[in-house]
A protein has these predicted regions:
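Long, contiguous domain-sized segments
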Residues: 40-147
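Acidic, metal-ligating active-site segments
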Residues: 1-47
């Protein structure tokens, strides 16, 4: 997170992935593109960008890297199951209201691209009794147009 007292504020987002081919004798591939370094850590009002915005940027960047990796896989490398090191739902509640829908739409578009590339996406449930599980189950039962 940017330090408001630093001489030169910045932040970086580092994304990595591991491709494991179940049943194959090939060793897993690791992929770590150059980090996304941001020297403009201020929002439109000149305030330091919030940790919530950085988290959303990271989550979107993870899906973009995942899509890039999916498009590089051999055609016979199916089925593909992806596991994100976080919850599946994008946390936008901490963003300013006017950004929430925009970021959610970006996230859904990226998830659609993952699906169009023939992959399934999974995350983890860190609190099984939380409302996240119920919310995801409710979303799963809706038609795509209703989401």
């Amino acid at each position: 997170m940017p330090d408001q007292h630093a001489i030169f504020p910045y932040y970086l987002i580092n994304i990595g992935s591991i491709t494991y081919r179940h049943g194959s004798l090939r060793k897993p591939d690791t992929y770590n593109p150059p980090p996304m370094l941001n020297f403009e850590p201020f929002d439109e009002q000149g305030q330091l960008i919030s940790p919530a915005e950085i988290n959303v940027q990271r989550d979107l960047a993870e899906l973009a890297v995942l899509i890039d990796r999916l498009q590089q896989l051999e055609a016979n490398a199916r089925p593909v199951i992806t596991l994100l090191d976080r919850q599946l739902a994008l946390r936008v509640i901490d963003l300013p209201f006017e950004q929430q829908e925009t970021r959610q739409n970006e996230y859904i578009a990226l998830l659609d691209t993952v699906r169009q590339n023939g992959a399934l996406v999974a995350g983890y449930v860190d609190r099984p009794r939380s409302t996240f599980v119920l919310a995801l189950l409710q979303l799963a039962g809706l038609e795509v147009a209703a989401i």
